[in-house]
Amino acid sequence: VRATEKFASMYFFCHSPQSAETDVAERGNKRPVWIMGHMVNAIAQIDEFVNLGANSIETDVSFDSSANPEYTYHGVPCDCGRTCTKWEHFNEFLKGLRKATTPGDSKYHEKLVLVVFDLKTGRLYDNQASDAGKKLAKSLLQNYWNNGNNGGRAYIVLSIPNLAHYKLIAGFKEALTSEGHPELMDKVGYDFSGNDDIGDVANAYKKAGVTGHVWQSDGITNCLLRGLDRVGKAVANRDSSNGYINKVYYWTVDKRQSTRDALDAGVDGIMTNYPDVIADVLNESAYKAKFRIASYDDNPWETYKN
């Protein structure tokens, strides 16, 4: 019996309806934030990053010359202060990730609710993008979603570095549909990660037929500094009545002051090598009043309206 069920009856004795309403109102007035553990490429790192405070992870996916997803691997160079060479076979990583996100499993982490796959498609020809999407979908269906039978529950973001590879999205959707599981697209979102002009990104989504589930990244390696100008443009698009963006995240943020700056700019997610740093800042009184760590009940495809 889960603790929440066990103590449900006690809750009604302890809480008046009014205080329950206050809890909901307080939750509704705080922006849900995703603390995104960066470069989680070995199964053992899933526990490590979630235990430090991450409710989301980012994993690199490399492809072979036939557009098969091959390894969870970044390689050199990578962020300052990190080992760049941890890896797993992609399908094995998916199995480990499934355990970490399947309720009832001994490795289950309730707080791990979102996974960003950083798709390293740079070595693929543009005309292989659709194939890469199909093969990626089949790998996820079999090894993560367990062919639709009580698989992992995390939401998935497909992060694509090249706007020219927009057909990856259609290929992914086509494969899930042909395999009989179009409903799993409800758990899938998108990101173009190349720091392109916001208007160009919008056009790529138009070509891809995407009208929702959009995360927009902005950032640079922690070895270099980058301002928040483009983040501001992405946030403005997100908050406009006709924008295409649902969520904005910034990477890679490892320091308290840059965390505060990103939160002040209105981001929904912060990618970091040090989840505990972000969690500490979110506990500061100024930020605790406005933000909270996202849970599974927070739909990552919905634009937050305060």
Swiss-Prot record:
Co-factor requirement: Mg(2+)
Enzyme class label: lyase
GO biological process: killing of cells of another organism; lipid catabolic process
Positions of the pro-segment in this chain: 2-27
Cystine residue pairs: 78-84, 80-223
InterPro entries (UniProt xref): PLC-like_Pdiesterase_TIM-brl
Protein name: Dermonecrotic toxin LarSicTox-alphaIB1ai
GO molecular function: lyase activity; metal ion binding; phosphoric diester hydrolase activity; toxin activity
Database matches in Gene3D superfamilies: Phosphatidylinositol (PI) phosphodiesterase
EC number: 4.6.1.-
Signal peptide: 1
One GO term describing the cellular component: extracellular region
Protein purpose: Dermonecrotic toxins cleave the phosphodiester linkage between the phosphate and headgroup of certain phospholipids (sphingolipid and lysolipid substrates), forming an alcohol (often choline) and a cyclic phosphate. This toxin acts on sphingomyelin (SM). It may also act on ceramide phosphoethanolamine (CPE), lysophosphatidylcholine (LPC) and lysophosphatidylethanolamine (LPE), but not on lysophosphatidylserine (LPS), and lysophosphatidylglycerol (LPG). It acts by transphosphatidylation, releasing exclusively cyclic phosphate products as second products.
Binding site for Mg(2+): 58, 60, 118
Record localization: Secreted
Active site per database record: 38, 74 (nucleophile)
Main location: secreted
Tissues expressing this chain: Expressed by the venom gland.
Catalyzed chemical reaction(s): an N-(acyl)-sphingosylphosphocholine = an N-(acyl)-sphingosyl-1,3-cyclic phosphate + choline; an N-(acyl)-sphingosylphosphoethanolamine = an N-(acyl)-sphingosyl-1,3-cyclic phosphate + ethanolamine; a 1-acyl-sn-glycero-3-phosphocholine = a 1-acyl-sn-glycero-2,3-cyclic phosphate + choline; a 1-acyl-sn-glycero-3-phosphoethanolamine = a 1-acyl-sn-glycero-2,3-cyclic phosphate + ethanolamine
Keyword set includes Lyase: yes
SUPFAM superfamilies named among the record's database cross-references: PLC-like phosphodiesterases
Transmembrane portions of the chain: none
Glycosylation sites: 283
Keywords, ordered alphabetically: Cytolysis, Dermonecrotic toxin, Disulfide bond, Glycoprotein, Hemolysis, Lipid degradation, Lipid metabolism, Lyase, Magnesium, Metal-binding, Secreted, Signal, Toxin, Zymogen
